[in-house]
Amino acid sequence: MNIHEYQAKEILRKYGVPTSTGLVVTKTEKINETIDKLNTKVYVIKAQIHAGGRGKAGGVKVAKSKEEAKKVAHDMFGINLVTHQTGPQGQKVNRIYIESGCDILKEYYFSIVFDRSASCITFIASTEGGVDIEAVAEKMPEKIIKFAVDPATGLQDFHMRGIAYELGFKDNQAKQMKEIVKAVYNAFIETDATQIEINPLIINSYGNLLALDAKITFDDNGLFKHPNITAMRDHDEEDPLETRAANAGLSYVKMDGNIGCMVNGAGLAMATMDIIKLYGALPANFLDVGGGADRERVKEALKIILSDKEVKGILVNIFGGIMRCDIIAEGIIAAAKDIGIKVPLVVRLAGTNVEKGKEILSNSDLKIIPAHDLADAANKIVEAIR
């Protein structure tokens, strides 16, 4: 789960990370009075969307008077902001964050992530802050600093000293950096985050370190322990089909293709998407019904797939282990009766109760195209939509 910048800063401040401060606006009629509450010479107006690249897209602007700030804020509120992460459709700006501006002497990058490939927590830092860190890693990899933390032993003093030293901090700034490292680590662990990113972390005109922008991503599986964080969820920033799927206990991610996929198991789902592309088409979604899906969940999964108007065909690929193939078959028939399936439907079943599942489907009035293996299924659905 992602949250907005102003929410991330609120959490980090609770752990002792110094951040820039401001006020959030969620209604246009509140813009003027909110700006009037800020006593500053420079205003920074920031669009609050769950996407990077806001600055280059016009989602972060500076104003040097109250009147200018009010005009900028009114112009920004409600627009569709298009960045390199939103796609061409953009993201509507329903919230803006208005901060007091400050002088910036130097910008840094600092983050903590869960590195699955190394099975450890990793700090990533760079003296090249305020820019896309992926671009820095590609063009100047020597500027990227990494410190791995063993989860068994946790954060140690040498991690904090090492990060401060590699970033070139000395004396009081080194002390500040060590405190920030410790605070960010504690926030990461205690909130079940998967990433905390501060970009940029700056030195202001007083020589102090300050988090000017912040991003936090949380592990959805840990949210049940953090109702205060769950309450920060902004459903307007999420795909409505993905939200609907999550409420039904399904793992669904919308994609750009036109072949809907319903699969059990994340690995099999990815393999299914790969082979669809191999045969010359693109998947419309990732959808994992899970190992314990019942008839109702299967029916809801098909309804969600068909809610995407771009879907021209559906491939159901089930390997019955815990999941029984006859349950899948019953769910398909129930969905067809409820909403009607008017696009080509290819079904590949294998595993528990497979013969019973095939019998249920063959005895139905549905025009189902059976497939005996994954390659056959991909070939048939691609041919069917052409």
UniProtKB/Swiss-Prot annotation:
Which residues make up the binding site for ATP?
A: K46, G53, R54, G55, E99, C102, E107
Q: What processes in GO biological process is this protein linked to?
A: succinyl-CoA metabolic process; tricarboxylic acid cycle
Q: What is the name attached to this protein's record?
A: Succinate--CoA ligase [ADP-forming] subunit beta
Q: NCBIfam families, per this entry?
A: PRK00696.1, sucCoAbeta
- Give EC number(s), comma-separated: 6.2.1.5
Question: What pathway does the UniProt record associate with this protein?
Answer: Carbohydrate metabolism; tricarboxylic acid cycle; succinate from succinyl-CoA (ligase route): step 1/1
**What binding partners and quaternary form does the record give?**
Heterotetramer of two alpha and two beta subunits.
Q: Which residues does the record give as substrate binding sites?
A: N264, G321, I322, M323
Q: Which PROSITE patterns match?
A: ATP_GRASP, SUCCINYL_COA_LIG_3
